[in-house]
């Protein structure tokens, strides 16, 4: 007679190729994977999802056969809510394992909020004597859920354009940039910045009010 409970590994939030996710962006699916730790025959696994560990208030206990991963479809995420995956195993004798819960996966459905962009490395500048260097600094972008992953900047001769930088350039999480270009006399250059959070939501673009080259002076 088999009276021993089977065992099951702690589930990971996300598909098996993604490891354990802490945050999830906009999606209509929720993926879970786990390890079947028991060396004896498992009859089936069950999974559920709740907003606290062990709870089933989002998805009730559902049979998953002997598969150790599942992608729940038509899953409605709510921004800022943390979802916990729960797993339990049954062996051939009908013994049930203890319930194991993930450490949670928080839905981040919103893009970062934007801040400001100044021309120059301090207070906003209107003119520059440099024929080769453009500088800008920015701050007050924020993402209170998954956090900001990186910033991108672009430089153009019209607000929001990137004809000088030839597209968007990633600058990690730095809050300033100093770049070398060949600048033309009496041309106004604009620096644009956008932020991407840790689930790849992208903020709106913020553009400086422009800095004009002046090589000759008074």
Each language-model region and where it sits:
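Recognizes extended acidic, P/S/T-rich segments that occur
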Residues: 22, 46-78, 152-184
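Solvent-exposed loop segments of extracellular immunoglobulin-like
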Residues: 40-45, 147-151
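Short, solvent-exposed loop/turn segments at the edges of extracellular beta-sandwich modules
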Residues: 90-96, 196-201
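Flexible, low-complexity linkers/stalks enriched in Thr/Pro that connect modular domains
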Residues: 1-17, 22, 38, 50, ...
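Short, solvent-exposed loop/linker segments at the N-terminal edge
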Residues: 19-27, 123-131
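Acidic, Ser/Thr
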Residues: 33-39, 137-145
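Structural beta-strand segments of beta-rich domains
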Residues: 28-32, 132-136
């Amino acid at each position: 007679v088999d009276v021993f409970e089977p065992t099951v590994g702690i589930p990971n939030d996300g598909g098996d190729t993604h490891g354990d996710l802490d945050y999830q962006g906009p999606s209509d699916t929720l993926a879970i994977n786990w390890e079947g730790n028991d060396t004896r025959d498992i009859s089936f696994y069950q999974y559920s999802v709740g907003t606290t560990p062990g709870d089933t208030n989002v998805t009730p206990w559902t049979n998953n056969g002997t598969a150790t991963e599942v992608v729940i479809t038509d899953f409605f995420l709510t921004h800022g809510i943390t979802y916990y995956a729960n797993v339990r195993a049954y062996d051939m004798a009908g013994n049930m394992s203890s319930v194991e819960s993930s450490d949670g996966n928080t839905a981040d459905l919103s893009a970062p909020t934007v801040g400001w962009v100044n021309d120059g490395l301090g207070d906003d500048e209107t003119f520059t004597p440099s024929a080769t260097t453009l500088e800008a600094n920015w701050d007050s972008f924020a993402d209170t859920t998954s956090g900001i992953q990186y910033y991108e900047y672009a430089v153009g001769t019209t607000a929001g354009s990137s004809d000088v930088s030839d597209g968007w350039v990633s600058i990690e999480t730095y809050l300033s940039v100093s770049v070398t270009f060949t600048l033309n006399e009496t041309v106004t250059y604009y620096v644009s910045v956008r932020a991407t959070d840790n689930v790849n939501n992208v903020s709106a673009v913020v553009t400086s009010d422009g800095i004009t080259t002046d090589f000759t002076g008074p």
